[in-house]
């Protein structure tokens, strides 16, 4: 516990808030190039093959990003847009790829929650 005179001399230091998505550098999204597309297996109670991609961002940082939705067209050297948002059962995956922008196609035959998967409105 500091004394009053110590507080007058130095003051209190503001605690810096750590960001959950540092690679975005406080931008809403970032563009990047896929360096590798692969599958990960999730943590203990779950079982699946989750689709992920290593992405080299315009900032020069390389991150692992999740590819949401069923099926995708991503390959190496594709240009993608990523946003923040972790995947709870994949350790180290803190970013999502935005579907329906740049080289990423939207999910076809998607009826509900279309805006999250870049799907066009189906013709009646």
Swiss-Prot record:
Q: Which CDD domains match?
A: Ribosomal_S12
User: NCBIfam families under this entry?
Assistant: rpsL_bact (TIGR00981)
Write down the superkingdom of origin.
Bacteria
Its gene is rpsL
InterPro entries for this protein: NA-bd_OB-fold, Ribosomal_uS12, Ribosomal_uS12_bac
Gene source species: Leptospira interrogans serogroup Icterohaemorrhagiae serovar Lai (strain 56601)
Q: How does it assemble?
A: Part of the 30S ribosomal subunit. Contacts proteins S8 and S17. May interact with IF1 in the 30S initiation complex.
Q: Name one GO molecular function term.
A: tRNA binding
One Gene Ontology cellular component: ribosome
**Biological role stated in the UniProt entry:** With S4 and S5 plays an important role in translational accuracy. Interacts with and stabilizes bases of the 16S rRNA that are involved in tRNA selection in the A site and with the mRNA backbone. Located at the interface of the 30S and 50S subunits, it traverses the body of the 30S subunit contacting proteins on the other side and probably holding the rRNA structure together. The combined cluster of proteins S8, S12 and S17 appears to hold together the shoulder and platform of the 30S subunit.
Protein name, UniProt field: Small ribosomal subunit protein uS12
What Pfam families does this protein's entry cite? Ribosom_S12_S23
Q: Where is this region: Disordered?
A: 1-32
Its ancestry begins with: Bacteria, Pseudomonadati, Spirochaetota, Spirochaetia, Leptospirales
What GO biological process terms are annotated to this protein in UniProt?
A: translation
Per UniProt, the keywords (alphabetical) are: Methylation, Ribonucleoprotein, Ribosomal protein, RNA-binding, rRNA-binding, tRNA-binding
Family, according to the entry, reads as follows: Belongs to the universal ribosomal protein uS12 family.
Q: Which HAMAP family match?
A: Ribosomal_uS12_B
**Gene3D superfamilies documented for this protein:** Nucleic acid-binding proteins (2.40.50.140)
**Residues bearing PTM 3-methylthioaspartic acid:** 89
């Amino acid at each position: 516990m500091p004394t009053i005179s110590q507080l007058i001399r130095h003051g209190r230091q503001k605690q810096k808030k750590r960001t959950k998505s540092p690679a975005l550098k406080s931008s809403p999204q970032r563009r990047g190039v896929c360096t590798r597309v692969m599958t990960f297996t999730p943590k203990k109670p779950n079982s699946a093959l989750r689709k992920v991609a290593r992405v080299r961002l315009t900032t020069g940082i390389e991150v692992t990003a999740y590819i949401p939705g069923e099926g995708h067209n991503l390959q190496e050297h594709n240009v993608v847009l990523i946003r923040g948002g972790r995947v709870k059962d994949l350790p180290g995956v803190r970013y999502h790829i935005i579907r329906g922008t740049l080289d990423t196609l939207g999910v076809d035959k998607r009826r509900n929650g279309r805006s999250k998967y870049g799907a066009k409105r189906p013709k009646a």
